Amino acid sequence: DWLTATEFLLKQSRKRQEELKTTLVNGGAADYTQYQHLIGEIKGLNFIENEIIGLHKRMETADEE
């Protein structure tokens, strides 16, 4: 169902964000271009995570009506 699918996506997004943050903390960006790429990926994943959370809230409200 939709809830299982979106929970899976949230889990994967959070896992990837942690991997990227660990890479940054450990100095894994070879240069500024790679740093920007990593930050961009984190921002994109964060955006998607917020959209999925918003979808959950809208679906819960729709289920209650």
Regions found by a protein language model. Give the residues of each.
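N-terminal acidic leader/helix
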Residues: 1-27
